Regions:
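Short, low-complexity N-terminal leaders and the immediately following helix N-cap/first helix
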Residues: 1-72, 78, 101, 139, ...
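Helix-rich terminal scaffold detector
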Residues: 1-10, 192-332, 336-342
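Short, low-complexity, intrinsically disordered N-terminal peptides in bacterial proteins
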Residues: 1-7, 18, 127-139, 315-324, ...
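Short, glycine/charged-enriched hinge/interface segments at domain edges or termini
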Residues: 2-4, 9-10, 43, 61-249, ...
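Conserved active-site and cofactor/substrate-binding residues in soluble primary-metabolism enzymes
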Residues: 4-11, 26-29, 33, 47, ...
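Flexible glycine/proline-rich
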Residues: 27-32, 41, 54, 87, ...
Length: 454
């Protein structure tokens, strides 16, 4: 590659991935505390689900053959000999001409091969006279007999043992994120503990003489720290464990000391915003080089062209312990939108790979969109434009007959500067403008990266 050629997004990302030795080690977590964690092992169901035949409805457990002649105007009568409630094992067998009242979810008693819903029955007294209205709620006094007004097929209104899962079925694969649904499934088969990847420990450092922390006086030339809190939130949303390294002045010794603190604390990655360009106060690259190898890349992306990446070790770590891979170092631009975009492009997928996510879960979901506005970017650099999409009254994106959403510039044409945070806050996606275009007109089709979806 020639010195003046910009790296493509893919080239830069592959260089980052090449430095990742593998995911973090596993640890045991309570399932109840596992939301968002990533499974580190192949997990199978220890039991069938359901674990036994059970009723899908309130009604009566019966022999289907006993109802073969039943009709609405010519019901058949069955003797009620007992009741089974949810959580109660049956202690009576269904015999020919009998029925057992059963609750939804209760085990099917022996001898029964179907359930007749209560809505298709009428309670009777011992003489066969109606003892209540048809379809009466199945929680009152147990009737002596019932009239069944419809024939029932074998297996009717039953959930068969293992119909959801057979014992030994894989339920969680390595790299699966524990969502509420996955946690519910694992709990439903009796699991309480799960092996998950440890969340990557990530140090976050903001830089700049003008940057002020929480509660500090801004004075005549200070600005509140936006990048630090934003990066902390982005790290956590990506599955990492964020650890603030504070705010460093534009001085080599301050930046160096804070990076060293992150390395000594055992961070798997350190992210620094600001100070990675080539100005006289851009000292991050030199501070990085005190601890490892670092390169300043010029990436063909807008916003966010300057980007530093490398690896480092804490003082005293000679690399002899294979269980302690080097720390990843990321130097991001200081402008808030550039920080956000470069994090999305390079840091987020790296952290998710460190955290053990499936390869197909490293990136944001991709869609197709039609631009509602003209867009101008820099030719030769891939543009990532902040947009919001048309939605219906339920908040669902509207789609045309080709399945495409309509994307509007967040903040309008003036809201696309790398310093404009207000437009970023209202965007729910990034529209991708190919390198070969510097202008796309309204109606052009583009790739869309959703930001409000994992």
């Amino acid at each position: 590659m020639t010195a003046d050629r910009l790296l493509t997004v893919e080239e830069a990302r592959e260089r980052v991935f090449a430095a990742i030795a593998g995911p973090t080690e596993s640890e045991v977590a309570w399932l109840s505390e596992g939301l968002g964690r990533v499974a580190a092992e192949h997990i199978t169901s220890p039991i069938a689900l359901p674990p036994w035949d059970n009723s899908a409805m309130d009604g009566y457990a019966i022999r289907a053959a006993d109802t073969a002649a039943a009709a609405d105007d010519a019901p058949v009568q069955l003797e009620v000999i007992g009741e089974v409630r949810a959580g109660q094992p049956p202690d009576v067998e269904v015999r020919r001409g009998t029925a057992i009242r059963i609750a939804t979810g209760a085990p099917i008693p022996p001898g029964a091969d179907a359930v007749v819903p209560v809505e298709q029955t009428t309670p009777l007294d011992v003489s066969g006279n109606a003892a209540g209205p048809r379809g009466r709620d199945a929680t009152g006094p147990l009737p002596a007999r019932i009239a069944v007004h419809a024939s029932v097929e074998p297996g009717g209104s039953m959930r068969r043992m293992g119909s959801d899962l057979a014992a030994g079925t894989a339920i969680i694969e390595p790299g699966t994120q524990l969502t509420p649904a996955v946690i519910g499934l694992a709990a439903g088969v009796g699991l309480e503990l799960v092996n998950v990847h440890r969340r990557p420990h990530v140090g976050v450092l903001a830089t700049g003489d003008e940057v002020r922390g929480r509660g500090a006086e801004l004075g005549a030339a200070g600005i509140p720290d936006a990048n630090g809190p934003a990066l902390m939130a982005m790290v956590e949303a990506a599955g990492g464990y964020p650890d603030t390294l504070g705010i460093a002045a534009d001085r080599f010794d301050d930046v160096r000391a804070r990076i060293c603190a992150g390395l000594v604390a055992g961070a798997e990655a350190i992210i620094v915003s600001g100070g990675v360009s080539v100005g006289p106060y851009d000292v991050v690259r030199d501070a990085f080089r005190e601890f490892g190898e670092i390169e300043l890349w010029r990436v063909a992306v807008q916003p966010g062209k300057p980007f530093a990446f490398g690896t480092a070790r804490a003082p005293g770590d000679d690399g002899s312990d294979p269980s302690r891979p080097p720390t990843l170092l990321f130097g991001l631009p200081g402008n808030p939108v550039s920080t956000f975009v470069t994090f999305e492009l390079f840091v987020r997928p790296a952290l998710r790979r460190l955290g053990g996510f499936h390869d197909d879960a490293l990136y944001r979901p991709i869609d197709r969109a039609v631009l509602a506005d003209d867009v101008t970017t820099s030719s030769g650099r891939r543009g990532f434009v902040r947009v919001f999409v048309d939605r219906d009254e339920r908040g669902t994106p509207r789609r045309d007959d080709r399945g495409r959403v309509t994307a509007h510039l967040a903040g309008g044409a003036s809201g696309q500067g790398s310093h404009v945070m207000s437009a970023l806050a209202t965007a729910d996606a990034l529209a991708v403008i190919p390198e070969e275009h510097d202008t796309l007109v309204s109606g052009a089709e583009v790739e869309l990266w959703w930001l409000d979806r994992a």
